[in-house]
């Protein structure tokens, strides 16, 4: 597992359904107790995103970010629904820069995932972001976005 690679996080959601969520590895070989973990960015889905087709990520969100500048990530906005598509490449901002100043509503999600729960794929098509594993950190995760997610879950 290397920085900049796209993997799938495989897990079972609270409705006992199998999920495969594409993630971008930003730091590997993180140890939590005895189990190896990887720090990843969630590849989210969006529809009709007004953001530019270039994703800006704060440099302090990554370890040695220059190593993954040709990687791709997905973004979504607070008004997003389940549909989305791949955008990128990644640009890195100065440490501590708040990405909402670049694009209103743009958010990213970071989390730590056990390596054994991740499967390698050569490329990652866009998947639904309606179900998120517990424990994701989401910048700009507003009450409006949470309400949208709850509505989507109720509809399904």
Model regions: which residues?
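C-terminal terminal-subdomain/extension
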Residues: 62-156
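Compact nucleic-acid interaction/catalytic patches
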Residues: 8, 17-20, 25-61
